[in-house]
Amino acid sequence: MLIHDCTKCSRLHLHLKELKKKFPSYHCKPVTGSGKLSSMVCIVGLAPGLHGANKTGVPFTNDFSGILLREVLHEINLNDFFITNAVRCFPKNNKPSANEKNNCQKFTQKELNKLKKLRVIVTLGEIAYKQIIKVYGLSSNVHKFKHGNIIKLNDQLTLISSYHCSKLNINTGKFSRHMLKDIFLKAMKIVNYG
């Protein structure tokens, strides 16, 4: 099944149909990952933003998180990346259920399997982190989420966890542009020097 055809999560599917009525020009469908399949860096976020990827159909575009993330990536000259989300549909109240997260896991696995040169996965937020841990058969009870954690998933692949670059995290001071930049500088160092 293609991600655009997925209707597995009835709550999300109905929510997107309601949003399409309210915002007829918006994408309002599941959002697939974006970027080059030859990328060595994959960024995994939570889910499409209402006025971001839910509008454009491209992860991390057109909203606060996307603008901040892409500005930082441009600033450090990290232009070759693949970007996706743990949950492919905009979740009501920005809170996907456990079942909705599980339903999207197979799409994440398929995307990651296509990235043959992948060296680093950067997760933005705990939900994305837990999904990647699960995809690689690790336990989130053993590998607890912590900002800046670096975990070797296998001989070729490293996971770096980060807080999400959400407006809430930035405005409350939990996270900063500098912290985000530092995460991606670590990713670039791993790609360039192992």
Walk through the language-model features, giving the residues of each.
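A polyanion-binding, active-site-adjacent surface
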Residues: 1-153, 157-193
